């Protein structure tokens, strides 16, 4: 019985690590869900605990404000480039990521965040929400080669 349990745990561990690795180090073009226009390039990185974060590397809208003027606290008036907008996103199975948070620099609001990676690894469908997911907003981001 102990051998069976050990083998099950051993087999499950690489799948979890691989799932996080699918996003780790990748760059994505964010698309505004209201205008359908590209907004920024963000890079995902994994911390020592396996949680993923995403940081803005480049703002794609020339007229976009360079600072997070509506953000509060430590993020107030911080440059958008270098701003971490996704935090604590964790792999929860094949191509699924949950329990994260996302900051909308346009409004300064933070939402709960879940995401699903497409089977071909080229699209990331994310949903930001407060309370229940049904009352949130969705965006699809596209992997940059």
Predicted features by range, described:
Residues 4-13:
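Sec-dependent N-terminal signal peptides
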Residues 22, 38, 135:
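Exposed loop/turn and edge beta-strand positions of beta-sandwich/beta-sheet ligand-binding modules
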Residues 16-27:
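N-terminal helix-cap/turn-to-beta initiation motif at the start of protein domains
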Residues 123, 129-145:
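Edge beta-strand at a domain terminus
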Residues 7, 17, 67-70:
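The N-terminal extracellular segments of secreted preproproteins, especially immediately downstream
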Residues 25, 30-113:
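Central antiparallel beta-sheet cores of small beta-barrel/beta-sandwich binding domains
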Residues 1, 14-17, 141:
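Intrinsically disordered, glycine/charged-rich N-terminal periplasmic/extracytoplasmic linker segments
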């Amino acid at each position: 019985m102990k051998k069976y349990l050990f083998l099950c745990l051993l087999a499950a561990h690489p799948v979890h690590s691989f799932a996080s690795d699918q996003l780790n180090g990748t760059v994505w073009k964010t698309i505004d869900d209201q205008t359908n226009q590209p907004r920024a390039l963000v890079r995902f990185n994994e911390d020592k605990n396996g949680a993923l974060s995403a940081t803005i590397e480049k703002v794609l809208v020339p007229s976009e404000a360079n600072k997070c003027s509506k953000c509060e606290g430590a993020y107030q008036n911080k440059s958008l480039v270098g701003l971490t907008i996704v935090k604590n996103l964790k792999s929860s199975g094949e191509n699924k990521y949950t329990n994260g948070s996302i900051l909308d620099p346009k409004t300064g609001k933070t939402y709960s965040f879940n995401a699903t990676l497409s089977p071909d690894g080229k699209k990331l469908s994310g949903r930001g929400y407060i309370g229940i997911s049904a009352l949130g907003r969705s965006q699809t981001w596209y992997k940059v080669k």
